[in-house]
A protein has these predicted regions:
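Electrostatic, structured charged patches in enzyme active sites and in nucleic-acid/phosphate-binding
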Residues: 1-216
Length: 216
């Protein structure tokens, strides 16, 4: 891995403002315990895939090397989501939420269909600048709809949005349906209710329906 230093270019309006914005992001592991995301000053990131090839690098990450790049292994629609987010005029930085539950990851507890507890790590946290100049954080979670735990994870995110939505600018769950990325806006109470009540086998039905819209 290579040592990544905290990225402060383009995001320094007050000292540590972006990191502080993340520190205010709270998550629910088991109610009523709320925990903050622990963002360290430095991060060690892998720069090669398991096979030895170099990982592609991306700009705009909260942590970056001296050249402003961060290595990440993203699939095609994660890349598409990242490109869409980075092109927004309000975009400041992005954070790849660690895939494993660590103090540096946003973790949301969920129960699967067998009532076993698991931990949902959403994909991206995106920092943006609000119209009043303050920084805010969004949860942007592109994911597959083919895993057995997709529905309980979506429902956990909907429940989390119900409890903590006011901490975030946006909370969006994204799935690819055919060739089109579709998004559920979990700030919307009606969409949350639809997700919470859904008991079908294929979560993609939610993203194909009228509650979802094309992600762009």
């Amino acid at each position: 891995g290579s040592e990544m230093c905290i990225r402060d270019r383009d995001i320094k309006n007050t000292t540590g403002a972006t990191r502080d914005a993340f520190r205010r992001v709270q998550e629910q592991t088991a109610r009523p315990e709320a925990v903050t995301v622990d963002l360290r000053q430095n991060l060690t990131a892998a720069t090669r895939k398991a096979g030895g090839d170099d990982l592609p690098t991306y700009t705009g990450h909260l942590y970056a090397d001296a050249g402003g790049e961060f290595p990440a292994d993203l699939n095609s629609w994660e890349r598409a989501v990242l490109e869409t987010e980075a092109a927004r005029p309000t975009f400041v930085a992005w954070y790849r939420n660690p895939a494993r539950p660590t103090p540096a990851s946003l973790r949301i507890a969920y129960q699967d269909d067998s009532a076993a507890w698991g931990s949902l790590q959403v994909d991206f946290l995106v920092v943006s600048r609000r119209s009043d100049g303050t920084l805010g954080v969004s949860i942007i979670d592109p994911h597959g709809d083919y895993l057995a735990d997709t529905r309980p994870k979506l429902q956990a995110l909907a429940r989390y949005a119900e409890l903590y939505g006011d901490h975030y600018v946006r909370i969006e769950s994204i799935v690819k349906v055919g060739d089109q990325l579709r998004v559920l806006d979990l700030h919307d109470p009606g969409i949350r209710a639809e997700a919470m009540e859904f008991d079908g086998a294929q979560v993609s039905a939610l993203y194909e329906g009228s509650h979802a819209r094309d992600y762009r």
